Amino acid sequence: MSSASRPDRQQGVVITHPNRDKPVVQATRATVVVLLLVSAALVLVVTVGGWNLLEGAIPVQIGYIVVYLIFAFFAARWNRGVLPISAVLAVLLGIFAAVAGPSWFARDKSGFAEATLNSGLLGLLTLLIVPVQILLVTFALRGFSQGWNVELERRDGAAGEDGGRLAPAHPA
């Protein structure tokens, strides 16, 4: 949305986000996006690799993949609202993965239906989801506390004679 179409914006006022310029905040955002993408990729590999054995879990896993990709998009655009939801979903997925991982190793014996990928590999990938989700929770909550949404209003130096000083505080 342009500032011309928003009636609450004053002429000559520039909105800045000072916390977004800090290297630690940019690194946190990049880490959250990477962890969301890695999580989606791991769930995708486990879903495709065990497609014929997962039965009822397929819609849930596809849902996780889609939601994590959407959240990665929004986190890359500095939307911190997805961070606590990402953390909650990561806790749930981490619990599911911790419970499901050993069962893939149990299927590595004769008499069980074969998955597309080796059951041992699927077990390893499923258990690998757990530390990735722990990291995602940690970095998502860290990013949420960094104040990505903090805005400062300042006068545009070219628009007024006050030299770009801060505009009077307005509720956001």
Which residues does each predicted region cover?
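Membrane interfacial helix motifs at helix-loop boundaries and amphipathic/re-entrant anchors
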Residues: V43-G63, I95-L127
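Loop-to-transmembrane helix junctions at the membrane interface
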Residues: A72-G101
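Cytoplasmic juxtamembrane interface segments
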Residues: L53-V82
